Amino acid sequence: MSTADQEQPKVVEATPEDGTASSQKSTINAENENTKQNQSMEPQETSKGTSNDTKDPDNGEKNEEAAIDENSNVEAAERKRKHISTDFSDDDLEKEEHNDQSLQPTVENRASKDRDSSATPSSRQELEEKLDRILKKPKVRRTRRDEDDLEQYLDEKILRLKDEMNIAAQLDIDTLNKRIETGDTSLIAMQKVKLLPKVVSVLSKANLADTILDNNLLQSVRIWLEPLPDGSLPSFEIQKSLFAALNDLPVKTEHLKESGLGRVVIFYTKSKRVEAQLARLAEKLIAEWTRPIIGASDNYRDKRIMQLEFDSEKLRKKSVMDSAKNRKKKSKSGEDPTSRGSSVQTLYEQAAARRNRAAAPAQTTTDYKYAPVSNLSAVPTNARAVGVGSTLNNSEMYKRLTSRLNKKHK
């Protein structure tokens, strides 16, 4: 073999399976270098071949065969280079197609955004109006007929409840009468207690207040609050719930006359078996209900107080006369005048005095009918000075007031 055959570089073939860009580039660079070396070595080989041909004809034939082999190798390398480039382009095309498919949604989104931004304000406004018309609920107009039907329905509901309350009260009365006659303690009146939650739920609704009062449901409330045939009061839960509901209802005088509820509430204010909390609530209801009857105002400023002039001399004379009368009574009865004071003693205080022991003071309630008339003249507002010397004026007014009071006490 010739030196050209020995020194011929090996071409690195790239398989179609190798799809990486770095390996393809390295093979292309190696082929370019090999071609350059082959081109530089061709003149030397031709010169050697001519010299050998002159020396030996057989060597000339060998050189020609070596040149033909080199040309065939170069053509094969060029064909491999073309094959490598085509393989590279096929892989790239597949990747580019995949990337184009993934980028299509983003391009479409951008195009839709551009169309939305390019839309005119008028078209956008029309679209918003259409959406508003679709989403907006139609207004339901109530007619007079619907209102009448609603009132009629509420009236029927209250009347049904009234009948149920009357039936429950009558069943409890019958149960108690049978218990009294037979002496069977197992008979318990529970009908009103079972119906109580329904009654409280209706009475506590503010929108049904007028319907309750107009349909005289207070009459059934009165029947529930009345004492039972054996003299006992209804259960505490019934009393508490019904009084709380009555406190929230706007009861008027005509409703009290029609239902007769006022007499039962007065009974609860006077009975000693009623709880203190319920008794106070009953007194509050009576005060509110009787105020419009007697024409009294609930405003304290409108309250009229009877006034009388206070005469200290007259009071002193009266106290002296009362003390003299008490001494005469004590002397006639033979008791020690010092054992009892000028005031009238109670039985407890008299018993303590007989045992020569001190009596605990008893709580007394004083109720005044008349208020004393104020005899102090109003101090003018301009009498008080502001600034330097204001304290002097205050002290002078204080002296005047004290001197006037001292004169009256004398």
From Swiss-Prot:
The modification Phosphoserine is found at residues 23, 40, 85, 89. Gene3D superfamilies: 1.20.5.170, Conserved domain common to transcription factors TFIIS, elongin A, CRSP70. Signal peptide: none annotated. It is found in: Nucleus. It comes from the Eukaryota. PROSITE patterns: TFIIS_N. The modification Phosphothreonine is found at residues 15, 86. It holds the Pfam family Med26. Residues 53-65 have a biased composition (Basic and acidic residues). The keyword GTP-binding does not apply. Residues 1-132, 318-346 are annotated as: Disordered. Residues 20-52 have a biased composition (Polar residues). Interacts with ABD1, RBP1, SPT5 and SPT6. Belongs to the IWS1 family. This is Transcription factor SPN1. It comes from Saccharomyces cerevisiae (strain ATCC 204508 / S288c) (Baker's yeast).
